[in-house]
Amino acid sequence: MPATYTAAQNVPPQTHATDAAPEGLTPEAMRGLSAKFRTSQFHVELRFAPGETFINTKQRRLKINLDAPVFTIGHTLGVKGFLGGDYRYNFTEASIYKRFWMNSWGKIDCYLKGGIQWNQVPYPLLIMPETNLSYIIQDETFELIDNMEFLNDRFASLYVSWDFNGKIFNRIPLLKKLKWREYIGFRCLWGELTDKNNPFLGQNAQSDILMMFPNGCRVMDPKEPYYELSLGIHNIFKLIHVEYVRRLNYNDYPGVHKDGIRFMVRMTF
């Protein structure tokens, strides 16, 4: 059971994400408009992958079988007062990964993950979507969500990618000769911020734990998940992957990136 310790965590100045403060809530009523805090935490994780096989080298162990389902569950306990930790919190997260073979139609990879922050915590300890702020493709991240755009204390995410293995492109002689491969990806995020962690509610005006959200942070509508769709080509020169990503909703905000192009270099044999 590893223990991690953050010596100091800087928190930027706290402001509302909306122009008007809610009734009963003023900046003076909230502690820590600009603050530093420490966290001390213990983390334990269990992983179960029946049928998974490996090759062992002197430096590391490499997976050679990606067909086995992988189940993980972990819990993080923040300890107040231990090594200077300022907050007590409990965060639980679980995930499932599975690959499905579609015969001549290639393969589908599915990754489902969810988590809950059980305690009232300042916003840096809330759940932030795993975002990719670069132009390099990163697995199991959202490509068009900005950093800290959505803050939740419970979430579920789904990543699905379907590699057609040339089933469509092989019908086009030039693409068949080039051995390019097509794929489609879908990403979905459901999130909710419960009342106990919402600093915009008057009932939390006297909280000595909550902090105001920075500008640009938003509260998701639990009735409307976030969606992304991607269309890609890989195996270009057996090396280059290119994909077009489109954000399907939550587009009515200033500065939102509705679409983009991402790249990756990965050797394919």
Regions of interest found by a model, annotated:
Residues 1-269:
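Exposed, low-structure sequence patches enriched in small/polar residues
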